[in-house]
């Protein structure tokens, strides 16, 4: 796909690494290993594979450079109860973001991460419906925000000149549980 984009447009300037899946919240010993493996494959390997392909293109194009924006999660900062695989996957994305920032520097490739909390998407339907597990064992409906706020934040990150970078940005529903999660 990267080659097709570069052929059509002459280069690749931005990658928004946005693939991700989650799982039903439960203690780790109750989770299916195949489901955990699938989550890691999508959330971690998906980011690696896309970043690798785009990095190569950005490194070899003239003028050299570009921007990679990884979709993290507030779970990369503060875990949600029963979400060990998802939390671990988003910590891996944070590690990738930091490494790409360093590795990309000589090639004018900037890398940043947006950590999103409770944007209203298909993935967060339960938050405003039946609720999600809380640290105290209860279920609670959590506030969500319009996904357009995420879109405008990503657009801001993407529109900066390569001499500037938003390394990490957190955009979340203002009233969502965050510190101490639940």
Which residue stretches match the model-derived regions?
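C-terminal helical subdomain
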Residues: 113-114, 133-180
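Alpha-helical segment proximal to the catalytic Tyr-Lys
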Residues: 56, 102-105
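Active-site helix of classical SDR
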Residues: 51, 89
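Substrate-binding pocket helix/loop in short-chain dehydrogenase/reductase
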Residues: 26-28, 35-38
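Active-site loop immediately N-terminal to the catalytic Tyr-X3-Lys motif
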Residues: 78-84, 142
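Conserved amphipathic alpha-helix within the SDR
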Residues: 1-10
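Residue(s) in the substrate-gating loop at a strand-loop-helix junction
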Residues: 73
């Amino acid at each position: 796909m990267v080659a097709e984009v570069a052929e059509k447009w002459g280069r690749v300037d931005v990658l928004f690494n946005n693939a991700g899946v989650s799982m039903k919240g439960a203690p780790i010993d109750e989770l299916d290993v195949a489901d955990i493996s699938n989550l890691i494959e999508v959330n971690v390997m998906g980011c690696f594979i896309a970043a690798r392909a785009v990095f190569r293109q950005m490194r070899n194009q003239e003028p050299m450079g570009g921007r990679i924006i990884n979709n993290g999660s507030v779970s990369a900062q503060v875990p949600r109860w029963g979400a060990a695989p998802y939390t671990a996957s988003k910590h891996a994305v944070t590690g990738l973001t930091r490494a790409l920032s360093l590795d990309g520097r000589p090639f004018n490739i900037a890398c940043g991460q947006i950590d999103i909390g409770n944007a209203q998407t298909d993935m967060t339907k339960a938050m405003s419906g039946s609720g999600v597990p809380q640290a105290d064992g209860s279920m609670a409906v959590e506030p969500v925000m319009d996904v357009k706020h995420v879109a405008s934040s990503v657009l801001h990150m993407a529109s900066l000149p390569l001499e500037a970078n938003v390394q990490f940005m957190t955009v979340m529903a203002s009233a969502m549980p965050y510190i101490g999660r639940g």
